[in-house]
Design a protein with these regions (language model features):
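Bacterial Sec-dependent N-terminal signal peptides
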Residues: 1-26
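Active-site-proximal N-terminal segment of extracellular/periplasmic enzymes that hydrolyze or transfer
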Residues: 21-62, 357
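Structural recognition of the beta-strand scaffold that forms the well-ordered cores
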Residues: 30-34, 41, 56, 64-67, ...
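Second-shell loop/turn segments in exported
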Residues: 39-45, 69, 123-128, 256-263, ...
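Short, structured active-site-proximal loop/turn typified by the sulfatase FGly-forming signature C/S-X-P-X-R
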Residues: 44-91, 147-153
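Short secondary-structure boundary/capping segments
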Residues: 47-50, 165-177, 305-313, 348-370
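His/Asp/Glu-rich, glycine-adjacent segments
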Residues: 96-287, 296-303
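Metal-dependent active-site segment of extracytoplasmic phospho-/sulfohydrolases and closely related
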Residues: 318-359
Length: 370
């Protein structure tokens, strides 16, 4: 397993982009975008279809195709830790998304903090980086520029916590109950603008929403496999199995939780990032600010449908549009020449080559022969 994981890591690419300028001024805002479980081919395979954010990044930036993390195991926690802390996760003790704690005598989440309290909502779990005695990129910047701000946003708690370093000004993660929350390890109360955002999020309103295709049917048949594919998730569990578009939410499920499994969640987290830029006045003075954005819903969707599915193709088409709008917003509010934007993909727990359930029936038949 280790050799296979290392092989995947070596073949995976990190993509980093920056505004082209031979002598750029010192950036006022550095934005890091991390797409959870984004394989390199999800950029190249749909290259002809991209017209928004990915297109802008590939056309205007520097593209590094032969870089990788020299660590395993490749889960969300270790991957985001490597990005935010710039260190090998295993050496720091981040050996997975969860692990056995000898002192507590139980399995713990990698960002679990029994001494912290949730702020921002009644639901959710308090998370922090308190169990790791080291600093990260955000801390290094703030040690040189004390008035710089470090804000880290993610759907997953470990995404937001690890990207921001040891003590970001504001890490926010989704509580699967309709709110972005944090813990009192970082601050006592959430800023008013975050509370306002949570009130306006209204995740319940997505209950009757349908996920439909953005492009004509023949385009999906050209770039992805057939829509009906054995092993993909079908949310309508009370009906005949049919994992195809349009995709809704089963009436028995909580839309506030399942919002994380839809492309719309990535749109909401970019709206949250825009609110952070506006209300925290990021990139508006001589102190460079850092903004980390983790697209965690992509991991959920790739687990549900697989990277070759029409659903993932459509999810990336939608994300590319959302990113295009976000880049336009940053240009208007910070200035093209005053920010540095880079996109990074991380190896999550594993990358699907195909949906494993599609092999279940042939495997069962082979076993029954024995």
């Amino acid at each position: 397993m280790i050799q296979k994981s290392l092989g995947l890591l070596v073949m995976a690419a990190f993509f980093s982009f920056s505004c082209s300028n031979s002598n750029p001024p010192k950036p006022k805002l550095v934005i890091t975008l991390v797409v959870d479980q984004m394989r390199p081919d999800l950029l190249t395979r749909f290259d002809d279809l991209y017209t928004g954010g990915f297109r802008w990044l590939m056309d205007h930036g520097i593209w590094f195709t032969n870089t990788h993390h020299e660590h395993s195991y490749t889960a969300t926690g270790p991957g985001h830790f490597a990005i935010g802390f710039g260190q090998y996760p295993g050496h720091a003790g981040v050996i997975g998304n969860s692990f056995y704690d000898r002192d507590m005598k139980k399995e713990v989440n990698c960002v679990e903090d029994p001494n912290a309290k949730v702020i921002g909502a009644e639901e959710g779990k308090a998370r922090s980086s308190s169990r790791y005695n080291m600093t990260g990129l955000g801390d290094w910047v703030k040690s040189t520029y004390p008035h710089s701000k470090v804000i880290s946003l993610g759907g997953k708690d470990r995404s937001a916590i690890f990207m921001g370093g040891q003590k970001p000004d504001l890490p926010l993660y989704y509580n699967y109950a309709g709110s972005f929350i944090s813990s009192d390890f970082y601050l006592d109360v959430l800023p008013d603008w975050v509370n306002d955002f949570n009130e306006n999020l209204n995740a319940e309103s997505y209950k009757d929403s349908l996920w439909t295709k953005s492009l004509p049917e023949d385009v999906y048949l050209k770039y992805a496999r057939e829509d009906f594919f054995q092993g993909e998730l079908d949310d309508y569990l009370n009906e005949d199995y049919s994992p195809v578009f349009p995709i809704g939410i089963d009436s028995s499920e909580d839309p506030k939780e399942f919002l994380m499994g839809r492309p719309w969640f990535e749109r909401e987290i970019l709206k949250l990032a825009q609110s952070a830029i506006t209300n925290e006045e990021l990139g508006q003075d001589g102190n460079p600010d850092l903004l980390f954005i983790g697209f965690s819903a992509m991991d959920w969707m790739i687990h549900d449908f697989g990277p070759h599915s029409q659903e993932i193709m459509d999810a990336f088409i939608k994300l590319e549009k959302y990113l295009g709008n976000f880049i336009e917003f940053v240009d208007e509010n910070v200035g093209l020449e005053m920010y540095y934007l880079h996109l990074r993909e991380i190896m999550a727990d594993y990358h699907f080559l195909n949906m494993w359930l599609s092999r279940a029936e042939p495997l069962a038949a082979s076993i029954n022969i024995i």
